[in-house]
Curated annotation (Swiss-Prot):
Molecular function (Gene Ontology), one example: ATP binding
Name the record gives this protein: D-alanine--D-alanine ligase
GO biological process, one term: regulation of cell shape
PROSITE patterns named in the record: ATP_GRASP, DALA_DALA_LIGASE_1, DALA_DALA_LIGASE_2
Compartment(s) of residence: Cytoplasm
DNA-binding found in the keyword field: no
Binding site for Mg(2+) 2: E325, N327
Domain ATP-grasp: start-end pairs: 150-358
Family membership noted in the UniProt record: Belongs to the D-alanine--D-alanine ligase family.
Superkingdom classification of source: Bacteria
UniProt cofactor(s): Mg(2+); Mn(2+)
């Protein structure tokens, strides 16, 4: 059987560029080379698409770009992708190793944040007609927007904390009104987040009016819409979901942050900023099963595919479960929760990558299958 050709795409122009590089390096190092030929495509912070065939370890530390730039013949311009980006839809499939054209069989996007997991690049793959790992346009777009995710979770009947949504102009032009609305509905402390930013980028905990105003302005710099959530005194519990139409949930894990909350550094930098415990201790069987049920329901109601990680709070005093958010392209670094949860559930890293690629082909075939309506 001939090998499938997988394009692993990383980088991008989002604030999570560095996270993407580290995740991509891990995927490349662990993918089954007996089953797949790998093409590596990096997107610089300026938006330039470059084919890369240098040392894998140079991806995580950022040195890959200088190496790729020295080989213009190996750049994607041959395939219709210029230094400014995509020039033709078909160019996405025709990535060229050396001077020989060979189409990509499947794309594994290891992209986080805006333009990577928000449905933008997924739409490009759809137009090009290429199977790809992960959620489609709808699930990616809604899953990236925390405010709209909450609206859909509410319709689904999933328990969550109270929240308010504002836009950037309100924060910049009518900050007093914004603060008054928040203080009239929520109590301190509360959390302020950009609606469309992942990995806790731009997220801050506000303990008083002064810190609230500061947090609102930080969030407004990261996105045009701002989400303000009530503080829940809860344990941070996470659950991984895998599949397409019949997804399954992993065991659950707990993040024990040493900081005030599980921020960007805690998620992606090795050190003492947080501790991950799998399985999460001191949770009743009923609570664990309810979390797993909610995770699958969240996955389905957003029309997700392939993979997602769903984050919850379990109240430290009452034991109540609150869904927090969903991540449709969770990190794949050495300390990332998603692969760790599946490893603890019996699916090792390399096998997980293989399953995700198989799910990509399955979804591709399903979305293009013609159904005959037998009803007159």
């Amino acid at each position: 059987m001939s090998k499938k050709r997988v394009a692993i795409i990383f980088g991008g122009q989002s604030s999570e560029h560095e996270v993407s590089r580290v995740s991509a390096q891990s995927v490349i190092e662990n993918i089954d080379k007996q089953k797949y030929d790998v093409e590596i495509i990096g997107i610089t912070k300026s938006g330039q698409w470059l084919k890369y065939d240098g040392p894998v370890e140079k991806i995580g530390n950022g040195d890959w770009e200088a190496i790729a730039q020295k080989k213009p013949v190996e750049s994607l311009s041959q395939a219709g992708i210029s230094s400014s980006g995509i020039t033709t839809v078909n160019s996405v499939r025709q990535i060229m190793p050396g001077n020989v054209k060979a189409p990509i069989d499947v794309i594994f996007p290891v992209l986080h944040g805006c333009n990577g997991e928000d449905g933008t690049i997924q739409g490009l793959f759809e137009l090009a007609g290429i199977p790809y790992v992960g959620c489609g346009v709808l699930g990616s777009a809604v899953g990236m927007d925390k405010a709209y995710t909450k609206i859909i979770f509410e319709k689904e009947g999933l328990p969550q904390g109270d929240y308010l949504v504002f836009n950037r102009k309100q924060v910049y032009n009518r900050i007093e009104d914004v603060v008054a609305q928040i203080e009239g509905r929520l109590t301190y402390p509360c959390f302020v987040k950009p609606s469309n930013a992942g990995s806790s980028v731009g997220v801050n905990k506000a303990s008083d009016r002064e810190s609230l105003v500061k947090a609102l302005n930080i969030a407004a710099k990261n996105d045009r819409r701002i989400l303000v959530e009530e503080f829940i005194n809860g344990r941070e519990i996470e659950c991984a979901v895998l599949g397409n139409d019949n997804p399954v949930a992993s065991t659950v894990g707990e993040v024990v942050p040493c900081n005030d909350f599980y921020d960007y550094e805690a998620k992606y930098q090795v050190g003492d900023s947080s501790k991950v415990v799998i399985p999460a201790p001191n949770l009743s069987k009923e609570t664990v099963e309810k979390i797993r049920e909610y995770a699958v329901r969240a996955f389905k109601c957003l029309d997700c595919a392939g993979l997602s990680r769903v984050d919850f709070f379990v109240h430290k005093e009452t034991g109540e479960i609150y869904i927090n958010e969903i991540n449709t392209l969770p990190g794949f670094t050495q300390i990332s929760m998603y692969p760790k949860l599946w490893a603890a559930s019996g699916i090792p890293y390399s096998e997980l990558i293989n399953k995700l690629i198989e799910l990509a082909f399955e979804r591709y075939e399903d979305t293009r299958r013609e159904y005959t309506n037998t009803l007159d």
